[in-house]
């Protein structure tokens, strides 16, 4: 597997979850990753592609020249030599953005070796000239060819240059010609976009993200007592990286309208974000302790996901598995995992206030387990080899 991170964040955990199951069935698996640390129990799977310095250099070049995915040639060539020796039966791609790998070098190897490829697209980056999500600005340039990108300064940000037109056509050429490739999307919404992109005609399969229901379940704890929230209605938000597009400032707006009976709790913030938020919001930094996270989910009265663009957020699944109802904006694939009555228009703070006051919100029923996700992937592996 190839992904920007290993064992952390939603995509990194998906990789290690699959690796665990493969190992249990007697298979061998490696996760090649680009950045950040790996939890110790998963180091046996991990192979790092780029050093921290190489990631920084790639990031600087991407910001200066708007060429994300086209740097790190030396590191990628070195990685391909390792892959040649390892000689995998199948390659499973995940996020190829993140300032760690060169797509031209990678796909030259893939086409030359004609290995079966599964590519799980967690966002839209693969078929745009720049951005990973465009729903918030209703951009449709990706349908015919990106240019004059309105999200040039959005991730992966470019400070000066707009190379979205070149990037679009470069990706279209690089990703074409892979004979045995299946694209997997976590949501029907993203599958419909891929079908309209230059990947049209490629086999596409929807496999919903799954979560570890042995961990994410109603969990007792002392979270209320620890933070003095015994008599409060807790409104929770969780993200691996908070930003405006994740709805961070919508929580600020909401906090200004709530009375003292409520407390907003946000998990996953940076230290600087914590310092900037108003006192009405309890700000908690990132945690890799998923058992602790399950306790927080279970304690909350309502989970709010005001995302402006998301594929199939696992936080929705985790919260509901812990017994907490979820409300989300009508955007992307986020709506596919919650009851329809819990969905409101994007940016509708008044609508959010109405749902917050509702004491009878439901939870979506279904099998969102890790087991169903992993089994579907392994069946796909067997079909592809």
Regions found by a protein language model. Give the residues of each.
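Aromatic "clamp/platform" in nucleotide-sugar-dependent glycosyltransferases that forms part
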Residues: 308
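A charged, aromatic-enriched C-terminal amphipathic alpha-helix characteristic of glycosyltransferases
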Residues: 357-385
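Conserved acidic donor-binding segment of nucleotide-sugar-dependent glycosyltransferases
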Residues: 341-349, 357
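Acidic anion/phosphate-binding donor-loop and adjacent secondary structure
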Residues: 192-195, 211-226, 275-276, 385
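Short hydrophobic beta-strand element within catalytic cores of glycosyltransferases
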Residues: 325-328
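Nucleotide-activated donor-binding/catalytic signature segment of Leloir-type glycosyltransferases, i.e.
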Residues: 268-291
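Conserved donor-binding/catalytic core segment of Leloir-type glycosyltransferases
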Residues: 184, 228-246, 252-255
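Short alpha-helical donor nucleotide-sugar binding micro-motif in glycosyltransferases
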Residues: 295-300
